[in-house]
Amino acid sequence: MDKRKELDLQKKATQIRKYIIEEVFSAKSGHPGGSLSCTDILTVLYFDEMNVDPKNPKWPDRDRFVLSKGHCAPALYATLAVKGFFPEKDLYTFRKADSYLEGHPSMRYVPVSYTHLRAHETP
């Protein structure tokens, strides 16, 4: 990876971390540690590796991301907002009444396809 790309990813990761802290602080609820710990991974995946299109989130040939760590919703939401899937201002509605940014991600509301299963659930 060239230095310019690496610097760009570092800047995006820094912005995502800032949003994670702001989401959790604004909601007065959440798990910042888990979200902060996966920021670099999400940044590289969404901004350098995965084939996704914020303008066409249901694109049949898109790559899929499986989130098995539901408490990292703030990191996923911040990454998706920075990528352009929804307005960054929506991050400040995290865990608020009537917000689509719930404490655990839900395919019903966030404009991408992913799944969060508990141990007792089946796909």
Roles of regions detected by a PLM:
Residues 85-93:
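A glycine-rich helix N-cap at a beta->alpha junction
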Residues 71-73, 83, 100-101:
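A short acidic, glycine/proline-enriched capping/turn motif at secondary-structure boundaries
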Residues 116-123:
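Single conserved hydrophobic/aromatic residue that forms the stacking wall/gate
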Residues 94-113:
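An acidic/histidine-cluster motif and surrounding catalytic segment
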Residues 2:
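Conserved, charged catalytic cores of large soluble enzymes
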Residues 44-48, 82-83, 122:
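Active-site catalytic microenvironments for nucleophilic, acid-base chemistry
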Residues 6-71:
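N-terminal amphipathic, basic-rich helices that act as targeting or association modules
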Residues 77-86:
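Alpha-helical support elements that line or immediately flank enzyme active sites
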